[in-house]
């Protein structure tokens, strides 16, 4: 299994368990699905003998419904105005460029060339995006984007390809 980590925050952003493709040589696009993760209480952990109780009260099951990628990776939703996002992406791109210059110099030109098309995709559809940081909520780290396919039911997420490092398990 391969885990993809943000180069700035070190947060695990996703794994190779999801359907993934490269988009514009700038993003990894992952297709997700809406799921519910149960967060109920394990009655065996409470103790006592339920059959000996006079009145048995049922415990409500709780859960989290959302995109399976967001839930599994514990991504945290955040908000941006268009102006705030432009400031963020400029700063984040500088960090990625520094990382590439030091660690993957062969990707510097590709990153620069793909940036314009990638940002055009994001800004042209800005009102539809939801934004997610890694679990640590590091404001300097990667902010992944989520939208829905034309069917309105299938979520997909974009992660900055050059802002990730692979770790094999």
From Swiss-Prot:
Residue ranges occupied by any TCTP domain in the UniProt entry: 1-169
Query: What's the family?
Result: Belongs to the TCTP family.
An annotated GO cellular component: cytoplasm
Name of the protein described by the UniProt record: Translationally-controlled tumor protein homolog
Kindly give the InterPro entries that the UniProt entry links to this protein. Answer: Mss4-like_sf (IPR011057), Mss4/transl-control_tumour (IPR011323), TCTP (IPR034737), Translation_control_tumour_CS (IPR018103), Translational_control_tumour_p (IPR018105)
Compartments it resides in: Cytoplasm
Function in brief = Involved in calcium binding and microtubule stabilization.
Question: Sorted alphabetically, which keywords does the UniProt record give?
Answer: Calcium, Cytoplasm
- Name the species this protein comes from: Branchiostoma belcheri
What sections of the protein cross the membrane? none
> Any idea which GO molecular function terms this record carries?
calcium ion binding
Predominant place of localization: cytoplasm
């Amino acid at each position: 299994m391969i885990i993809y980590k943000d180069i700035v925050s070190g947060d695990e952003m996703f794994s190779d368990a999801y359907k993934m493709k490269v988009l514009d040589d700038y993003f990894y696009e992952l297709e997700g699905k809406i799921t519910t993760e149960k967060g109920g209480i394990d009655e065996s952990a409470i103790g006592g003998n339920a059959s000996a109780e006079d009145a048995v009260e049922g415990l409500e099951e709780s859960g989290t419904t959302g995109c399976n990628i967001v839930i599994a990776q514990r991504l945290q939703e955040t908000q941006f105005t268009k102006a705030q996002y432009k400031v963020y992406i400029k700063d984040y791109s500088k960090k990625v460029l520094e990382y590439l210059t030091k660690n993957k110099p062969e990707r510097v030109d590709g990153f620069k060339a793909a940036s314009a098309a990638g940002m055009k995709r994001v800004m042209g559809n800005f009102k539809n995006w939801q934004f997610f940081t890694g679990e640590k909520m590091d404001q300097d780290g990667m902010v992944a984007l989520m939208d829905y396919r034309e069917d309105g039911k299938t979520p997909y997420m974009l992660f900055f390809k050059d802002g990730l490092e692979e770790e094999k398990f």
